[in-house]
Amino acid sequence: MGRGLLRGLWPLHIVLWTRIASTIPPHVPKSVNSDLMAGDNSGAVKLPQLCKFCDVTLSTCDNQKSCMSNCSVTSICEKPQEVCVAVWRKNDKNITLETVCHDPKFTYHGFTLEDATSPTCVMKEKKRAGETFFMCSCNTEECNDYIIFNEEYTTSSPDLLLVIIQVTGVSLLPPLGIAIAVIAIFYCYRVHRQQKLSPSWESSKPRKLMDFSDNCAIILEDDRSDISSTCANNINHNTELLPIELDTLVGKGRFAEVYKAKLKQNTSEQFETVAVKIFPYEEYSSWKTEKDIFSDINLKHENILQFLTAEERKTEMGKQYWLITAFHAKGNLQEYLTRHVISWEDLRKLGSSLARGIAHLHSDHTPCGRPKMPIVHRDLKSSNILVKNDLTCCLCDFGLSLRLDPTLSVDDLANSGQVGTARYMAPEVLESRMNLENMESFKQTDVYSMALVLWEMTSRCNAVGEVKDYEPPFGSKVREHPCVESMKDNVLRDRGRPEIPSFWLNHQGIQIVCETLTECWDHDPEARLTAQCVAERFSELEHPDRLSGRSCSQEKIPEDGSLNTTK
């Protein structure tokens, strides 16, 4: 029946599409026509846009009438809300054209995307020093391929609209029927397969896709994380909440409580373990800050806590705000160091993964080169770092974090306040003398805090010899929960830092770690290393044969991490 329908409709397709081809004016690009053919899709699920994506390329396009981008790369935008953007620049040296996807909620090159709902890319001039600068945005398929500088070139043939309306219904019937059939077959297969699964089979195979309710699908990966999600970095807007059963309280902080919980399936008693961070009604702002940070899809990284979704819930205790994330059974780093002495290899893995996570947080691009908003944590400490099953770190607790949006004014940054935990505050934060003109100074406060955490790790490493009981940075020099004034006396007046015993330096790898953390807690923020530099240094520690040039000692670190004194 399906084949007969296709055969019957095919001649009509040829006739109608021939009419379309004959009525398209030469100046109307493919992207505009594609949008017209889409019809009115209000009420349908919004799919990611298809845009030209060539970043910055040299162009011969002038700014008089209109032109094509000549970009050969078409990309599906990562997020449904992203639109197509084109940027045309002319300076004394050349003309360049940039085509990308971008979320209109955020500025691009410091400008708001005011025309993000336009079906065509009509250039508007922006004021920029030293160059002629035009930018446009639009929300139809590949609409940034056809760049318009004069709005009279945006008109299209009235006959074209009528023809396209006629052909749309006929064109969509065959693929729609095929799609429904494929979905039905796949659904039946999934239901049949799920019913046949047994616990013994599950325990002997790699963990696969598991469906639950209509909210989202969860992909269970390897032992590096207990859970990850295809709908990660999203807030759950569905009226039906995720089927979660709270288990035990595993942590409590200033703003929220953290529970171990069971995420149940619809059709069985099986469940997966997740963590649920619950904020009371009065801590809405902290929940919103952390939710907004997690909702940035470019934040995803193996050394940043895996986010599942965020929910608003009504309980007998009143309204609550939930963040649902991966659960890591080893707990936070402070707890882990209190209970365990670590080896040199453990220290290298923990330190390296911590630096990589912070470097990604601070970076203005993803590892694959996509633009990303830099973020500063502002409350880095060992209790805000989780230990994964493979003994690597992941950052969590972003309730005090700050997005370094270039559109923020100095006043906006000044109003962000003196935040963090006093024991881990950098000197300039304690003294409230941050350089608000330079956003890099915010990142360097995180680097200072990271140095203290690296010291904590090193103090519990058996490669240095005698290992004392765990103590936080500054140990008994300050009380258990020191105030800002107490830390000012220690850090500013006395220029105090945690002690590095001389025998730690007998191990070549530990010596490099100590040199690194000493440079990271320098009193001068501009003299500190960047998180990326620290990550690179730890990467070098994976190759002991390359370390001789970094130390006075000519001895090498063998695979077991001990100091090799063999000549």
UniProtKB/Swiss-Prot annotation:
Residues 188-567 are cytoplasmic. Disulfide bonds join C51-C84, C54-C71, C61-C67, C77-C101, C121-C136, C138-C143. ATP binds at V250, G251, K252, G253, R254, F255, A256, E257, V258, K277. It comes from Rattus norvegicus. Homodimer. Heterohexamer; TGFB1, TGFB2 and TGFB3 homodimeric ligands assemble a functional receptor composed of two TGFBR1 and TGFBR2 heterodimers to form a ligand-receptor heterohexamer. The respective affinity of TGFRB1 and TGFRB2 for the ligands may modulate the kinetics of assembly of the receptor and may explain the different biological activities of TGFB1, TGFB2 and TGFB3. Component of a complex composed of TSC22D1 (via N-terminus), TGFBR1 and TGFBR2; the interaction between TSC22D1 and TGFBR1 is inhibited by SMAD7 and promoted by TGFB1. Interacts with DAXX. Interacts with DYNLT4. It holds the Pfam family ecTbetaR2. This is TGF-beta receptor type-2. The chain crosses the membrane at residues 167-187. Transmembrane serine/threonine kinase forming with the TGF-beta type I serine/threonine kinase receptor, TGFBR1, the non-promiscuous receptor for the TGF-beta cytokines TGFB1, TGFB2 and TGFB3. Transduces the TGFB1, TGFB2 and TGFB3 signal from the cell surface to the cytoplasm and is thus regulating a plethora of physiological and pathological processes including cell cycle arrest in epithelial and hematopoietic cells, control of mesenchymal cell proliferation and differentiation, wound healing, extracellular matrix production, immunosuppression and carcinogenesis.
